[in-house]
Amino acid sequence: MAEALPYVAVMTISTIMYKRLGISNTDIALYTGWLYLPWVIKPFWSPFVDLMKTKRWWTISMQFIIAIGFACIAFSLPTSFFFQLSLAAFWLVAFTSATHDIAADGYYMHALDDHEQSLYVGIRSTFYRIATVAGQGLLVILAGFLEDSTGDIPWAWSMTFGIMSVTFVLLSIYHGFILSRPASDRPIQGVTARTVAREFLETFRTFFTKKNALVAILFMLLYRLPEAQLVKLINPFMLDPVEKGGLGLTTGEVGFVYGTVGIVGLTIGGILGGIAAAHGGLKKWLWPMVCAITLPDLVYVYLSYAQPEGLGIVNVCIFIEQFGYGFGFTAYMLYLIYFSEGAHKTAHYAMCTGFMALGMMLPGMMAGWLQETIGYPHFFLWTIICCLVTFAVCAFLKIDPEFGKKK
């Protein structure tokens, strides 16, 4: 849960909060898009975390610094220059959260043996989803309730981030007492920063000289091209008034629709995608998954033209789109694993996740400007056109028919 909440706060809650505070879609997409950067470059500094302190120390310390970041956001919102101050605090949370991911993943492998890791992986994934619902759903609903009850939007969001700050202080203290101290969790001895840098350069070289590396990188960057643009504008679209082309939902309604119903659809889609791939393999399910991650984006074209008044149809549309995304995203993650196989598997997979974040960052940064230039209906039509790029990059993939099948 401590891994999911900061990421959700940086990537999703920030866009809702800034929209409610009157920031333009152009600025929201551009400046929150930059916040992907720590996850893009995370592979570059992750080896150095191994050289200093323990994974346990890093995990607990980063949680406390995340709490400080959330507190800074809370205190900045009532000021006249809240945008600059809160963005700086979000940068702190983003870099700290990315470092926390490195440490927590490493601690997981030190504290548990192979059997225990397999046993708890499902529980870990479940708690990640619960935290996502708590962040995108419950916390946004809470902020909406405070907005409605007080009429003071900055104060409502200050309280929300204050609660998140207190939560992470408590998590840091709790983990300080509860986390064990595995004997294997210690700084790497006899290895210098220069050695790590040299090994990383070798990993970097072998990554780019792998067979079909160019096609793989294009796939990592472009498979989610439509989603990279959509994700920054979905919440502003739902919050914007009808006369501005939006759906006119309240903050609390957005928390329920996108943060709860949407996450349920995403989770179910992901589970079924994993089951399907396990039975037929990635190659068999690639094109159904490509269709699943792209074609449901048509619901936003419908919503932008119809602008339905009731929540029922909006919930159905968001569920369908997020279900498709969850199902289709399975192919993406499986291909990253497939491409990473061989020497330096772990390091190559980390580099793949960097390209994954970059593929979301760059298109998303310009999405707000594009939407404000052409309007919501044409923007959503544009994302449908971008689906052709997804189909194109997948056409060049070479995949072993047996990969992903249950042995």
Where are these regions (language model features)?
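Intracellular juxtamembrane helix-capping segments at the cytosolic ends
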Residues: 98-112, 327-341
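Helix-to-loop junctions at the C-terminal end of transmembrane segments
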Residues: 41-54, 268-285, 371-372
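Transmembrane alpha-helix termini and helix-breaking/packing motifs in multi-pass membrane transporters
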Residues: 47, 134-155, 274-275, 362-378
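Helix-loop boundary and gating motifs at the non-cytosolic
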Residues: 1-39, 214-219, 223-243
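C-terminal transmembrane helical hairpin of 12-TM major facilitator-type secondary transporters
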Residues: 284-332
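Cytoplasmic membrane-interface "Motif A"-like loop-to-helix N-cap segments
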Residues: 51-65, 278-292, 311
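C-terminal ends and interior cores of transmembrane alpha-helices
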Residues: 60, 64-81, 291-309
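Intracellular loop-helix junctions on the cytosolic face of multi-pass helical membrane proteins
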Residues: 23, 74-77, 81-85, 99-100, ...
